[in-house]
Every structure is written in C-alpha cells, then in structure tokens.
Curated annotation (Swiss-Prot):
Stated name of the protein: Holliday junction branch migration complex subunit RuvA
Major location (coarse): cytoplasm
Domain free text: Has three domains with a flexible linker between the domains II and III and assumes an 'L' shape. Domain III is highly mobile and contacts RuvB.
Keyword S-adenosyl-L-methionine: no
Family: Belongs to the RuvA family.
Region (Domain I): 1-64
Naturally occurring in which organism (per UniProt): Rubrobacter xylanophilus (strain DSM 9941 / JCM 11954 / NBRC 16129 / PRD-1)
UniProt-listed GO biological process terms: DNA recombination; DNA repair
GO molecular function annotation: ATP binding; four-way junction DNA binding; four-way junction helicase activity
Region (Domain III): 153-196
Upper classification of the organism: Bacteria, Bacillati, Actinomycetota, Rubrobacteria, Rubrobacterales
Highest taxon of source: Bacteria
Length: 196
C-alpha cells in the first residue's frame, strides 16, 4: 500500500496531481482543497494517499493532510459513497465543516454537493454523526450539546418562526448548552433580540 508520496510536484490539474518520486510519476486524484494547498509545480511536496483496489483498476487518491485522508476514509465507509463522491464532498467543505454539518444534522449542506442526492446526504449525516476524526486531535469542532435533540429541535423551531438557518444557528452557538428545547429557544431569542 502507498501511504504517502514525497517528491517533486510535476503536474497539477482539476483531476489531481502527479508527484515524481525517484523518477516514477504517481498520479493521484485529489479534492480541490488539496490542489489549493499544494505548492507550485516544480516544488517538492508531500501527499498523503489512499489506494483503492478494484477488480479492473488500482486508484490512488491524494490529500494535503492526514485529516483530509481520514475524512475520505469516513466518507467511503458509508454505503453508496464511492471515492469520487467522497472527493466531491471534500472539494465542497473541509473535514471540520463536514463533521460539524453531520453533528448538526445539516442534510442540506451535504445535498448541495454536486452528484450527492438527498437520500445519500441523509445517510451521510446518520452515519457520520457522533464520529470524530483522530487526525484532528480529538477536537470535533462542535460544542457540547449542539449535535443532540434539543439543539436541533430549537434550530427547527427558530427557522419555523421565520429566522434564517444561519441566524438561528449563530444565536444557538452563542448559548451555553441547555437541558430543554424551550431553554434553547428563550436563550437564542434573547441573543437575537440583543443584536437588533
């Protein structure tokens, strides 16, 4: 298995990268975030990789960080999510944003990814919720209480009252963890009222 490549970056295009390691050029498909993070063509780079072996092909996928690679692994562990779809998700959001969206139950964020339908987005949220990426150093990026029922119900209630999803989430993030939906809503409304 090829775990990482270190060498000269000889090609970078929307499909991925080619890294020259000791005279051998390895092509790896990569998300847009990796393409942006890597240095210019001709410079030395390190690409963390994941090899996928299929009946008809051996595919190499490259990432700028181990956290991205771990997020790729988490995505491809979900039924109906293949490597290409996982790259599309990582091109649309960072691993931290991905895990936060899953913790919040934000199906719309996943469904906005090109090629990802609503049912697959729901499956991603269901299977990724509660997971942590070890490469992130244990920080899930979501404060305590945000991924649970009362927080989610309060968010839905606030959007039902006419507040935008962004405004509701911003207010709820500013509130310390609460026991009930009603407590979340009251505290969030005070925050929103204080901003106006």
């Amino acid at each position: 298995m090829i775990d990482r490549l270190r060498g000269q970056l000889v090609e970078k295009d929307p499909e991925g990268v080619v890294v020259d390691c000791g005279g051998v050029g390895y092509r790896a498909a990569a998300p847009l975030s990796t393409l942006r993070a890597l240095p210019a063509v001709g410079e030395e780079c390190v690409v963390h990789t994941r090899m996928v072996v299929r009946e008809d092909a051996m595919l190499l996928f490259g990432f700028a960080t181990r956290e991205e690679r771990e997020a790729f692994d988490a995505l491809t562990s979900v039924s109906k999510v293949g490597p290409r779809l996982a790259l599309a998700v990582l091109s649309a959001m960072t691993p931290g944003q991905m895990m936060e969206a899953a913790a919040r139950g934000d199906v719309h964020r996943f469904a906005a990814v090109p090629g990802l339908g609503r049912k697959t987005a729901e499956r991603l949220v269901l299977e990724l919720r509660g997971r942590e990426l070890a490469a992130a150093g244990g920080g899930g990026g979501v404060a305590a209480g945000e991924g649970d029922g009362p927080f989610m119900e309060a968010r839905e209630a606030l959007t039902g009252l006419g507040y935008s999803l962004e405004e509701a989430e911003r207010a709820l993030r500013d509130v310390p963890p609460q026991e009930t939906v009603e407590q979340y809503i009251k505290a969030a409304l005070r925050k929103i009222g204080g901003r106006r």
